[in-house]
Regions:
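A beta-strand edge to alpha-helix "cap/lid" segment located at domain peripheries
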Residues: 1-125
Length: 125
């Protein structure tokens, strides 16, 4: 697989992940995120994959929209670093949050699939 093909596959998986967040598609998120994935929120809260998905399953967190822009993908062998900006509307604990985030996302090739292993976001003013 060329780096251009890998980049295209990673972009497709990341788009699918953002869409799954909005749809609440747990099966897709389970498959895209590695079992040991770490999710660092803009608030500084760090969650495991299980903790993050549990909040979505319970309805404590629900994404209304997740729109990425300026997505860049850099591939380093079997790892890829994604950066970009996202406009997000989320319902958290009954409160609506409209956020603009700068993010870094890391994917690693595990077997024949690229899996998300880390996410970190920072709130933009």
């Amino acid at each position: 697989m060329t780096s251009q093909q890998a980049e295209q596959e990673i972009r497709q998986r990341e788009t699918r992940r953002f869409e799954a967040l909005v749809r609440g598609d747990m099966a897709s998120l389970e498959e895209i995120m590695a079992d040991d994935a770490i999710y660092t929120h803009a608030t500084g809260v760090v969650e495991t994959k299980a903790e993050y998905l549990a909040k979505m399953k319970s309805g404590e967190v629900r994404y209304e929209s997740f729109a990425p822009e300026q997505l860049q993908v850099r591939i380093y062998g079997t790892a890829a670093v994604l950066t970009g900006i996202a406009s997000v509307t989320a319902h958290v604990g009954g409160e609506v949050r409209n956020l603009r985030l700068r993010f870094t996302d890391v994917y690693v090739k595990q077997g024949d699939r690229w899996r998300m292993v880390a996410w970190q976001s920072t709130r933009l003013p």
